[in-house]
Amino acid sequence: MKELSVHVRQQTRALLHKILLKKWRRKRESLLEWSIPIIIGLHMGLFSYLARNIQVLEVPPQDLGSLNEFNGSSLVVVYTPISNITQQIMNKTTFAPTMKGTRIIGVPSIEDLDEVLLHNIPDALGVIFNDSFSYQLKVLRMYGNPFLKEDLLAHCWDTHSQAFCSLSKYWERGFVALQTAINAGIIEVTTNHSVMEELMSIDGINMKTLPFIPRDLSDYEIFILFCLLYFSSFIYFASSNVTKERKQCKEVMKVMGLQDSAFWLSWGLIYVGFIFIISIFIAIIITSTQIIMMTGFLVIFTLFFLYGLSLIAVTFLMAVLLQKAVLTNLIVLFFTLFWGCVGFTVLHKELPPSLEWVLSIFSPFAFTSGMAKVIFQDYNLNGVVFPDPSGESYVMIAVFFILAFDSLLYLVLALYFDKILLYGAEHRSAPLFFLNPTSCFRKTANRNKVIERDLDPELPSDEYFEPVDPEYQGKEAIRIRNIKKEYKGKSGKVKALKGLFLDIYESQITAILGHSGAGKSSLLNILSGLYVPTAGSVTVYNKNLSDMQDLKEIRKAIGVCPQHNVQFDALTVKENLTLFAKIKGILPQDVEQEVQQILSELDMQNIRDDLAEHLSEGQKRKLTFGIATVGDPQILLLDEPTVGLDPFSRQRIWGFLKERRADHVILFSTQFMDEADILADRKVLIANGALKCTGSSVFLKRKWGLGYHLSLFMDETCDSERLTSFINHHIPYAKLKAKTKEKLVYILPLERTSEFPEFFSDLDKYSGQGLMSYEVSMSTLNDVFLNLEGEPSTKQDFEKRETATDSESLNDMEVAYPSLSQVQETVSTMSLWRMQVCAIARLRILKLKRERKAFLIILLLLGIALLPLVIEYVANALLEVKNNWEFKTDLYFLSPGQLPQGLRTSLLVINNTESNIEDFLQSLKHQNIVLEVDDFENRNATNSLSYNGAIIVSGRQKDYRFSAVCNTKRLHCFPILMNVISNGILHMLNHTQYIRIKEDIFSPFIVLVWTGIQETCLFILCVICSLSPHIAMSSVSDYKKKADSQLWISGLYPSAYWCGQAVVDISLFSGMLLTSYFTSYTSKLLNIDMTSEIVFSVIVLALGCAASLVFLTYVISFVFGKRKKNSTLWSICFLLVIAITFEKVANGPFNEALVISATMLVPSFALNGLLVVLEMRAYQYYIEFEEIKHGLSAVDLLLCLIPYIHTLLFIFVLRCLELKYGKNVVRRDPIFRIAPQSLKAQPNPEEPIDEDENVQAERLRTSDALSTPNLDEKPVIIASCLHKEYAGQKKHCCSRRTRNMAVRNVSFCVNKGEILGLLGPDGAGKSSSIRMIAGITKPTAGQVELKRLSSAVGHQGDSRAEFGYCPQENGLWPNLTVKEHLELYAAVKGLRKEDAVVAISRLVNALKLHDQLNVQVQNLVAGATRKLCFVLSILGNSPVLILDEPSTGLDVSGKHQVWQAIQAVVKDNEKGVLLSTHDLAEAEALCDRAAIMVSGRLRCIGPIQHLKRKFGQDYVLELRVKDVSQEPLVHREILKLFPQAARQDRCFSLLTYKLPVTDVHPLSQAFHKLEAVKHGFDLEDYSLSQCTLDRVILELSKEQELGTVYEEADMTLGRKLLPPSDEL
């Protein structure tokens, strides 16, 4: 092991470097991340600069005149109830000078009063008497009276001709005049003393107004809303990256030594830097464009910076709690908007200070509160400076403190829940771990405590378990005792491991074998510390795996290669290795050397600078293995480390492990039995979670009666029965395994090798009796695995079961596949189109139904949309109270003993009488008002802005004259002062009662209530319209899963794909739109009378708007969806576009042409456009007091029609995109009118050189086949001169893009009834060739022709054929079951429902999928998933089958089932199969011919035996010695007996040689010599086999690795080629 020193600082620096590299290389993502806040900032600055920064200069005092000057002749005053007192009061009112000509009407009830008011708009006022001293005035909302306590933003307006202030409306519109007349009437009725002249002579005066910035309330709300969303892009990408990295890599990195603090520090520091920079930008924008004029840069920057930090912290917290990137984004967005909108109450000054500080625990609320305070100070032209004598600076310091506290709190909670919540690894801390650090994992440790009696359990029977060699006694490195593991499934607990007892030894390679789902990965995950066992214990070098401290020590010595690949796609191979080397704690000075050593030993030097995302699956697997071995860990836990690797790479890894066997513990799982046979010293076989047997290959093969495979090739003259009798005579226990017309295969027992010399000597003499040739090979562990899988009790049972299973499976498959052509009937083109539309619609419904996360996201977004509605209701409720409020003195004036607070001041009384006014002052004091009295000569009341109001008393005693002076910021000052004066006069007349007055603002229609939330219903629709990316971007996930390619190849029409999705998406979306419409209506937020015409127009428009937005989203998905789905980001973009459009339309004068233009240019504005027109028209009727016309105008109809024009346009655009950039269709699309295209053969850029003679012959045959007019003579697949180049990466921005050649002038064809195997190492071009043949990738040059099925649908004149395709990636939907997949593809391929049932049933029977039929794909084991993908490819009656590594990940029995299915396909001589595989045993078992590709070229082609004879005529000899010290002696003896023997692998106790045929033949002499060596040197065993196809491929693969074949094409072709694009 390397010396390790794990430091958080080193890990943090490494992770920071990784993040920066990712940001730099993902330039589009980074540009989007930075551009959104920059655009928001520039928009706010430009908006403010152009139109909104108009400062109102100082307004001098204004004399409004006396009340006598008001002319109320046009007024209609209605009062209730009618009584003697009320009639007297109202009669007195008529004597007021202002009331001359006023009609006064008495009605019995409030309802009657409302009705009279409605019929006398606009000059109607209502009076409701509660008693003789209490009444309320009911006025129309349009009357213009202020209805808020305080206008925070624009209390006065500069109209150029004169200044106008809001509070003057009370005086000028007659409200105060009527109030004063009624007060005078009450006083006269009560005291029989007339004060009408005295009160009506009161003058009204406005104090002077200081300069201020007038802004509409909505301006600041929109400004704050933009500020709240300013960091949205950073939050989006932070949550996405952190959540995905935690899910994919963090736990594996923790196994390798990663500290939690390093992980969070790296992401935290990078985004602290980002927030810092972007906060500087927005602070500069806000201050330089004077959005905020009086507050400095530092305050704005600090406020934004701390708010951004809090959002990053809450993002980390939500990422830990929710563990889903999209859900995290939406919750943070909801959190921001909700609490930010609640913070608007601070802007309205509706919350008590204590509650405001309590709610500041939510950072968006605290931020909105801080912005509101800045706005208040700016409004008063004070600004926030430090220090500030007024104390406002300390309030901002408190806001800064609470934001910093919020950030710290969220971060602490994130780290806490990261410790205690179960995610990824099952090890977690106790909830109160911070109280006692030693208590961490106590529960787990106790539960899995080592039980002494388990340390030495009763060993299983020796019949199944080979005894351990004495040399390994005492070297037990890992001791597993009674390990059990259970998982919670939907149907109950699933037992993965059932009481395993096992020891793993040092200096020994141990392989874990078993079928898919046997428990191999569960065991390895437990040993690595990722999983916690349900019961039992594990010790590693006497350290308990369940103890936290021991686990940390164990992990320092562990290297883990999980089943999934672990790498960072944005990093190169070298950078990945460097990163993990630093995480593991390798000393900085040793990192480079360690990385170079790994690159060299695993032969990755040629791909060291390639990005991981551009590697093939095999190369990614090799990189993951390299990461596991960094630091030379003493314990290697490898879960299928060589899956997907080519033979050469596999041999490299085998050699690597063999060299490190000494003093190391190597435990690996595999589905590749040959790998276990060759590499592992000891095999452990697990079945259904239980241990079946352990031992070496020799033990297992001997135990289960397996040995050599003798293959005899004969002609028609050979008597097979006589030959069998001959063999049984020499080898009595020989068994016939397989028999064909040309070949017999026997199994010769391993213990009979002593009889082989005589047997082969006699067999050589038998060759003249029809025996053409023979070959011998050693049995593999495949046979052992197949026998052990069924758990029979005896060897005889093994033989019977093996024969029965093979015959039954083959019979089932032979019945299943031909039946497909029998049940398929021709259907018409349109019938097939309808079937496909229904199938895709059902697929979309199933995806929506099963994806609970998607539904939760939509519901959450709906909640965000309805959030302002809730706030609107709350605001309306508050306004209902305020609109019915009483004009009390405590609104503006202090009471005796009350400390100055809020808006209240003392009442200033100016004495201008030159006498004592003590009687009046006493009357005021009896109203509980704090007075401040001064003389007129000393104090100018109009300049006393520190007071809310003042009363100037003039005249003489007992005949006072009054002037009411009001601060223009106190909107309700005049009614209050008039009541104060009236009550003062009443008290001076020796009456103790006080007059009380309330105001009730009456709305005659359902109108939008101004609450500070701009057009709530429009906001709802804006958010709903922005939801289309969350609804209609399903195609992006199909593309990511490669499911769309599979559907297209299966014959799906492009139009059926889009229309099938649209049927569901439009229905769902239109339902949401209509719901939001009618929710707004029923919430009484719309000024619209819902007549039948309007309801119809709304429904039509909603359907059209839903269709246009859905198809617009489809276009966006097609163009931009090939990288990431980004539905949340697109929703934000939609929302911003709608908001900006509405802002431009709504803030100007109403213009129908502008609305139409906006609707045409912005499809998502269509629904809002009609709403704006209808609302504004109704509002115009309202303010002009006209009768509402309910009909639809031409503009309304045009607005309803525009979305349908958009829909047709987007469908046409989608059709054009499919035609130009889409995949080539199999059938002619009846709707899009897209026909299969014959690609013109482009000239090949290079000519073939130094080709093998068989390759040249194949090229000529392919050329002749293309020109053959006879269709019956044509092969089923013709690939002529295929050439493919991909664009490489730029080394830097100024360099030219390189061209990488994947396939170089390859020609071959597949005949009817033939299986052609396409073989070669990783990067040889196999998959690229298959994708070109399948039509997924367009060839750079060359031509492909496939056989067409004459009875298939829609092929008249088509140049493309329908075929079955099994891609390398499983293009499946995780939430769909196996049965649903099969039914979907059956419909797409045109099978009628009843036929599909039959076909599916037979295929399920043949491939043993009964138990998985109703299981979702995400719950299937890897083997079952791969099997399903294969079944989908053979479903239907396709003449061509193209299979790209179809058996990858399958266990042995699964592979055999797939092989039998493929053989059944070609049993019909009209069909052909092209097969790509890394499993050379599969190629030998299935392929009639094999084509081997190396470096993009076809190296050789021909029958398997031909290739063996041509390239691999040698034999392989393996000898296993008991005593290692005898190796040199044995080696010399072998060289003496076989002079040309070449030693191959140098492995512990295993000698491997390659022997030429001349040294081996005759076999009788070879076996005679080997028997002598076996007995002379006491060998454990030996085997002699003819060179396999594996060896042939291995030798040819070296050409690619060594660079002897490939040439330079701007770069080394030995490097991995870029992954192919799906674009044609």
Swiss-Prot record:
Pfam families: ABC2_membrane_3 (PF12698), ABC_tran (PF00005), R1_ABCA1 (PF23321). Its main location: Golgi. Its EC number is 7.6.2.-. ATP 1 binds at residues 514-521. Glycans are attached at residues 84, 91, 576. GO terms for molecular function: ABC-type transporter activity; ATP binding; ATP hydrolysis activity. Residues 478-713, 1282-1520 form the ABC transporter domain. It is an enzyme of class 7 (translocase). It is found in: Golgi apparatus membrane. It is a multi-pass membrane protein. Widely expressed with higher expression in heart, lung, brain, spleen and testis. One of its GO terms (cellular component) is Golgi membrane. Keywords: ATP-binding, Glycoprotein, Golgi apparatus, Membrane, Nucleotide-binding, Repeat, Translocase, Transmembrane, Transmembrane helix, Transport. ATP 2 binds at residues 1320-1327. The chain crosses the membrane at residues 31-51, 222-242, 267-287, 297-317, 326-346, 356-376, 395-415, 854-874, 971-991, 1005-1025, 1058-1078, 1094-1114, 1130-1150, 1154-1174, 1194-1214. SMART domains: AAA (SM00382). InterPro entries: AAA+_ATPase, ABC2_TM, ABC_transporter-like_ATP-bd, ABCA, P-loop_NTPase, R2_ABCA1-4-like. The keyword Heme does not apply. PROSITE patterns: ABC_TRANSPORTER_2 (PS50893). Belongs to the ABC transporter superfamily. ABCA family. Probable transporter which may play a role in macrophage lipid transport and homeostasis. PANTHER family: ATP-BINDING CASSETTE SUB-FAMILY A MEMBER 6, ATP-BINDING CASSETTE TRANSPORTER SUBFAMILY A ABCA. This is ATP-binding cassette sub-family A member 6. It comes from Mus musculus. The gene is Abca6.
